[in-house]
Regions:
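Transmembrane alpha-helix interface motif
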Residues: 1-44, 48-57, 142-152, 156-159, ...
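Membrane-helix interfacial "entry" motifs
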Residues: 14, 37, 61-65, 97, ...
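Alpha-helical transmembrane segments and their helix-start/interface "positive-inside/aromatic belt" motifs
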Residues: 25, 64-74, 249
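Transmembrane helix-loop junctions in multipass membrane proteins, especially transporters and channels
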Residues: 41, 45, 60-64, 88-96, ...
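Alpha-helical transmembrane segments and their membrane-interface exit regions
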Residues: 51-61, 76-79
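Loop-to-transmembrane-helix entry motif
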Residues: 69-77, 114, 118-121, 202, ...
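Juxtamembrane/interface alpha-helical elements of multi-pass membrane proteins
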Residues: 73-187, 194
Length: 268
């Protein structure tokens, strides 16, 4: 399960999506998230889903690689679906047994929550798969740069994001090594129910946390030895510039927004 996590990993390529300015991707991701949460009718979910599928095709990222990112949260998806079945009480009762009652509105909301989580994870994974952590950080820093006039720590926030994204694949690799070492000693992480499998993961957490703190300490010492003092006087090898592709992407997101709003109003 751990090796299936693709968040923070970069898939090398030279596709149209890879070449987009990271600021375009970040702003587009915000628009995409808003659109996904604006959808309140089942047929309208086809629009953001189709848009994500087109982006995956243009990015030339293997579909299996994107779908693999859903495996680690499959239990969360099932859990959220079941919880919403019993949390929503409005609507017409379709299933009633003892003290349990499930309404049509509860089923609809459960489906909506599940679809939103899937679409959001696919979109987020696609953004990290097609953007290097450094480019993503530079884009975020440039977007937040106007806030530095009111002493907002734009560079520090961007640096924290870079380190976090960079360490995700490292910690995944470290956890995989620890699991293999534990399995060589007879540990079993695959069999048993969900609670038993979660309990079996405890021996992995302690050495993983120790390794994470050790790596963080080594990184801090390396940054101090290189006289790192934040973003003051920092220059960049690659200066971010908007291109023709970014204009096309902005138009595509505008069309996506217009289609979604129109479908929401026209579809009963």
């Amino acid at each position: 399960m751990i090796k299936d996590i693709t968040l923070g990993q970069y898939f090398p390529g030279n596709s149209a999506i890879h070449r987009l300015d990271p600021r375009t991707k970040l702003l587009g991701m915000i628009v995409y998230i808003v659109i996904v949460f604006l959808v309140t009718k089942t047929p309208v979910f086809i629009i953001p889903a189709l848009f994500a599928a087109i982006c995956i095709y243009l990015a030339r990222v293997p579909l299996g690689y994107v779908i693999r990112s859903l495996k680690p949260i499959r239990f969360l998806l099932v859990f959220m679906f079941i919880v919403n079945l019993f949390m929503v009480r409005t609507g017409k009762t379709v299933i009633a047994f003892w003290i349990i009652s499930i309404t049509d509105e509860a089923i609809k909301q459960s489906v909506y929550i599940t679809l939103r989580l899937v679409l959001l994870l696919v979109g987020t994974s696609l953004m990290t798969l097609t953007t290097t952590p450094i480019a993503l950080t530079d884009g975020l820093e440039r977007l937040l740069m106007p806030l530095s006039k009111i002493h907002f720590p734009a560079h520090e926030l961007a640096m924290m994001m870079t380190i976090a994204l960079r360490f995700i694949p490292t910690l995944i690799e470290e956890a995989d090594k620890i699991m293999k070492a534990q399995m060589a000693r007879g540990a079993d992480f695959e069999s048993g129910n969900l609670i038993k499998r979660a309990r079996n993961m405890i021996p992995i957490l302690v050495p993983l946390f120790v390794s994470a703190f050790r790596r963080a300490d080594e990184l801090a010492m390396a940054m101090e030895s290189r006289c790192y003092h934040g973003g003051e006087g920092r220059t960049r090898m690659n200066v971010l510039k908007f291109g023709r592709g970014d204009g096309v992407a902005a138009a595509a997101f505008a069309v996506l927004t217009a289609l979604t709003i129109a479908a929401q109003k026209l579809i009963p």
